[in-house]
A protein has these predicted regions:
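Active-site-proximal "nucleotidyltransferase
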Residues: 1-44, 52, 56-118
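Short helix/loop capping segments that flank catalytic or ligand/cofactor-binding pockets
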Residues: 47-49, 68-69, 147-150
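Short acidic-glycine loop/turn motifs at beta-strand connectors
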Residues: 49-55, 132, 143
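Internal, well-ordered alpha/beta segment that forms a basic, Gly-enriched binding/recognition surface
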Residues: 81-179
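Beta-strand-enriched accessory nucleic-acid recognition/scaffold domains that flank the catalytic cores
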Residues: 179-187
Length: 187
């Protein structure tokens, strides 16, 4: 674990916006070999894992990180108290099917199984066959917290996720390979 200070996962800036402020360093990205993540646009964001304050498994939305009205759900009863409607329905199923882990993860909810096409937000995702699992999650962030979840530090999720009988994990990988040494060498 790095001792370098980390930022909380409140909002991710779009790199292309830096061009508007005169910072052209983002253009070097186009010629730098490496690994990048692909953002999946699901809803709501689901946070799950072991609460370091209680040692118990929990599920929730980003409200688990709230400073004041914290909504951490260690049971179906707590989900019923803290949430309603579609979000409560999703959290109940996530509580039943997401893997128990000592870590804390965040991912976008894509949908319930049984279809081959999903539009959780604006983007439609097509699977080659009907999804047989109960839920589809796109994990993207892991957190480290010693005590309270509101003090958790976000890190990109580098874990390899394998589907289970109940959960389909969506985590596309993308790689960039270029022959140029700098943006100015691009023809």
């Amino acid at each position: 674990m790095s001792t370098k200070p980390q930022m909380k996962n409140t909002h991710l800036e779009h790199p292309e916006d830096s061009i508007l402020t005169g910072d052209l360093s983002v253009l070097d990205w186009f010629v730098t070999p490496g690994h990048l993540s692909v953002k999946i646009d699901g809803a709501p964001a689901i946070v799950w894992g072991t609460n370091p304050a209680t040692g118990k498994f929990f599920v929730g939305t980003k409200s688990v990180f709230n400073k004041i009205k914290i909504k951490i759900n260690h049971s179906h009863e707590e989900i019923g108290v803290n949430h309603e409607g579609r979000v409560a329905d999703i959290l109940h199923v996530c509580f039943d099917w997401l893997p128990r882990t000592e870590c804390i993860y965040q991912g976008d909810f894509i949908g319930f199984g049984g279809l081959s096409e999903y539009t959780p937000n604006i983007i439609t995702y097509k699977f080659p066959e009907v999804v047989s699992q109960n839920i589809i999650i796109a994990p993207h962030t892991c957190y480290y917290a010693e005590n309270a979840l509101r003090d958790a530090v976000a890190m990109p999720d580098r874990a390899i996720w394998y589907d289970t009988e109940s959960v389909k994990f969506v985590k596309p990988e993308a790689y960039i390979l270029h022959r140029q040494d700098s943006f100015y060498d691009v023809e």
